[in-house]
Amino acid sequence: MNRRKLMASLAVIPAIGLATPVFAQEEPLKVGFIYVGPVGDGGWTYQHDLGRQAIEEEFGDRVETTFIESVPEGADAERALSQLALAGNELIFATSFGFMDPVINVAAKFPDVKFEHATGYKRAENVATYDARFYEGRAVMGTIAGRMTESNKIGYIGSFPIPEVIQGINSSFIHARKVNPDVEMKVVWAYSWFDPAKEADAASALIAEGVDVILQHTDSTAPLAKAQEAGAIGFGQASDMSNFAPSPRVSSIIDNWAPYYIERVGQVLDGTWESKGTWAGIAGGEVEIGEITEAVPAEVKEEALALKDSIASGEYHPFTGPLNRQDGSEWLAEGQVATDEELSGMNFFVEGITAKIPE
Amino acid sequence: MIDPLSVFLLLLSASTPIVFAALGELVTERAGVLNLGVEGMMIVGALAGFAAAHATGSPFIGFVVAALAGAAVSMTFAMLTQFLLANQVASGLALTLFGLGLAALFGKPLEGIKAPAMVPGPLRINWIVWLGIAMVPLIWWFLNRSRAGLILRGVGENHDAAHALGYPVRIVRITAIGFGGAMAGVGGAFLSIAIVLQWTEGMTAGAGWIALAIVVFSNWTALGVLAGAWLFGGVTVLQLRLQAAGVAVPVQFLSMAPYLATIIVLVLISAQQKYSRRSGRAAPGSLGQNFYALR
């Protein structure tokens, strides 16, 4: 459907060029998206597509959206982005970290097109970045994980060793340890955002190591299916994944991109859009905590929700000292809070995690 | 310490989709047809098998339906290449794209649904895994010891000669393509019904391409396919286990290990072939060439 739409919009370009604008009919604003996975992944890409649908609902005929799904990170992304820019999209959302350099390259070639890049840190005159503080949600998941594990081993399926993922691993671990000093964390890198078979194998490997709570930073529901088979528990990632509730999915981190997307499209429509970096979290509504199910004891649920509330109110920051780096050197002193710069470049594990970050 | 038996059991199931798909492709290629649509046939099998298993509650019926569905989509390829004499490489790629799109389209309502539970076979291993292993000697026997297998190989080695001897080249090839489709379908269904336990769009994630590479790796022998699939699956599983166990080996090395191992063996095989050429062990002579009877 998306490809066909794209073809149709490509075919329309010459027609627009030739037609003299006798009728002052306003052309709809064209908004394009590239996704790293299929919209049916039930996780990360699915949530971005919900955001796209929210734009259509909000603005109706004033916007026209297109998307290209399953775009590999790397050179192919440049082709997809150029394609969208050539098709007349004035605002393009690139929704994965690995699209960062392609976005910067293509944006330089199309100075009139505005680009929005998710989870990256490179900006330009016409490139804005946006991200969500997933680590806030991870703190809540870590608390539940630390309380729920019986083997005192929790597992984490990482995608790529980039700051966003490392923040999540650290945040989960810090908060699991806080409620359960005996907890250990095993980390497996899948080197993919979306590969259900590999994610399932990674979950099996963790379970074979004695892990009974699995956290994931990959996009499919395969690890949850594996957890269920083995009697372990896990969490919804990016999307609610409520099909697996009440167990193995005991809670979830939900990315809600709709408010940001609507805001930015609105700004393009009224001409106030400018390049900036946005990083909202639980307080801004971009990170939501999915329902904590009855598989979790009431007091643990209460504790988790209390943590969530204190993060939302700004009273507590998940990275508050005293915290040491993995090698034992001091990172944050008592009461000191990590800065956004430190977090967005985070490339180390905190003390207590035995796994090494691939370098 | 990592228990070798548990790694082996994980490897058995992780490599099964590739074992099926590669064995099917082996037979197809031995008949002289290069079908690059394995990925497409696998994903159609994954979807059809999952849908049938979900609808009937019986994983067994799911696998049967997956085989039928895989064979059915492979017939579009057979039609293009055997009757319309279209280029096999292009048609195969088209079949992959077609299969991925078709499955994505019809798979929408099945997203998020869980697969019915399977009754495990011996050693708490899925019956389909054992079936995949059993297919290896069966296919070896068929190719090397049966008359039908000899004809199939003859068609693959030199279709003009086979035609001159009166063998129905086209029918043999269509049958082989159908068999390859059915096997790829079962492999795909194993992924959705037994490994991932649900349907997800794009879930084959390149397994079909690995199966194609393993056929080359195997030097077109059934035992080689099993060895290749186990090597690839084994290293994949092992690297994940090593990571989970926190063994201090650089993760990048572990991640590339399956591919690296495959490349090394390919180099060894081609070196060995260069120095000791043995008949009937390299690529089939008519592989990838279309056949039409001049008279």
Regions found by a protein language model. Name each.
Chain A
Residues 24-359:
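A residue-level marker of the well-folded mature domains of exported/periplasmic proteins
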Residues 19-21:
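N-terminal signal peptide c-region/cleavage motif recognized by signal peptidases
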Residues 1-11:
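N-terminal secretory signal peptides and thylakoid transit peptides that target proteins
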